[in-house]
Amino acid sequence: MCIRDRTKAEIEDLVCEHSLIYSRGQLGFTEFLPNERVAMRPVRQRLVRTHPVTHAKSLFLASHIGTIVGWPRPEAMAFIRDLMEHATQPRFVYVHRWTRHDLVMWDNRTTMHRVRRFDDLHVVRDMRRTTTRSEGPTAAQG
């Protein structure tokens, strides 16, 4: 992903807390029942992941990162924002232009993805998801 070697060394061991409560809160959804808060408690994940098959390193970035463990929140969020801006530069982004009978597959372990709006009143779409066994969280839970 073309990150400077110094930055790579600095981020190698960082752990982020991923929280659906955080990402929903960014959109204004802040009312959660106690059992929902328990079900959506933060999950710790290493920021840098090594793919178990290819051994390629990638950043595990998502809109639901709420902090970096051990960092003051403002600095953590500014740093994550900078990494997200870097990762979503046009040179790193694939945009699929759908045509009839297309099949698109990706490996969630190394891909940031986002759905875009589409005209569901006039366009027929068949979406299916397959999930194989996952490695689960990549950092000790605190």
Model-identified regions with their sequence ranges:
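Non-heme Fe(II) oxygenase catalytic core, chiefly the N-lobe of the double-stranded beta-helix
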Residues: 3-103, 108-142
